[in-house]
C-alpha cells in the first residue's frame, strides 16, 4: 500500500453539479455514454448474468419510437430518447421487437414457441422482470426508471468515494 495522498481527491464530483449535468445531457443512441450507462445499469443488478462477449448488443427503446409516432401518447418526443426508456438488448431480439407496443414486446423479451422451435428470450434480467410485472410501459414508468438510474449511479459514486 502506498503512503501517497489520493491525487484524485481534487477531481471528485459535486453532487448537485453532477445531477444538473446528468439531467441536461442528451442520451442519444449515437453517443457512447448512452450505451455505457444502460450497460452499467443492467449489470448493476446482482441477478444479471454475464453474456458472451460475442453477443451483439443494441439499444432498445422500451417504449418504441414508432409507437410514439403513431399514438402521440407521450408529452414530448424527448421522453422517447430518455435514458429511462433505453435498455441494452441482444440484436437478434431487438430486430424482432423494435416497433411493437410493450404488450407485444413482452413475447420477445420472454421468448416464445414457433412451428420451427423455441425462440430464446433476452438475457437482460430487467427486461424479463418488466415483462413479468407490467402490462404497459408508459411515461410515468420512463420517468421512474430514469430517476432510479440516476439515483443508483449517484449512490455508486458515493460508495466509491467519488462525491465531494
Question: Language-model segments: which ranges?
Answer:
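Long, cytosolic, alpha-helical-rich C-terminal regions that act as interaction/scaffolding modules
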Residues: 79-82, 86-164
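Intrinsically disordered, low-complexity N-proximal targeting/linker segments that flank membranes
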Residues: 2-79, 83, 88-89, 95
